[in-house]
């Protein structure tokens, strides 16, 4: 690597809204505040919810279904 062209790395703290604190190396230089992390993200915790959009589709077809028929 060429000397003098790379940004300096510093250890920062990334704090999640769930209270999880992660120490990482970064070039940002200041602490980060996260909305979600691996400890509270629904995909990783297994608390995913299936969103049923059937009601929305029926509502759309009810409002605009007659426009397509001639």
Curated annotation (Swiss-Prot):
Protein name: Large ribosomal subunit protein bL31
Annotated S-S bridges: none
One matching Pfam family: Ribosomal_L31
Assembly behavior: Part of the 50S ribosomal subunit.
Family named by the database record: Belongs to the bacterial ribosomal protein bL31 family. Type A subfamily.
Gene source species: Shewanella amazonensis (strain ATCC BAA-1098 / SB2B)
Domain of life from the UniProt record: Bacteria
InterPro entries xrefs: Ribosomal_bL28/bL31-like_sf, Ribosomal_bL31, Ribosomal_bL31_A, Ribosomal_bL31_sf
UniProt GO MF annotations: metal ion binding; rRNA binding; structural constituent of ribosome
Function, as annotated: Binds the 23S rRNA.
Residues that bind Zn(2+): 16, 18, 37, 40
Span of the signal peptide: none
PANTHER family: 50S RIBOSOMAL PROTEIN L31, CHLOROPLASTIC (PTHR33280), LARGE RIBOSOMAL SUBUNIT PROTEIN BL31A (PTHR33280:SF6)
């Amino acid at each position: 690597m060429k000397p003098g062209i790379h940004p300096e790395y510093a250890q920062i703290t990334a704090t999640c809204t769930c209270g999880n604190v992660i120490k990482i190396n970064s070039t940002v230089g200041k602490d980060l505040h996260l909305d979600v992390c691996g400890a509270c993200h629904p995909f990783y915790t297994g608390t995913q919810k299936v969103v049923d959009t059937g009601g929305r589709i029926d509502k759309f077809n009810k409002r605009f279904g007659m426009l397509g028929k001639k």
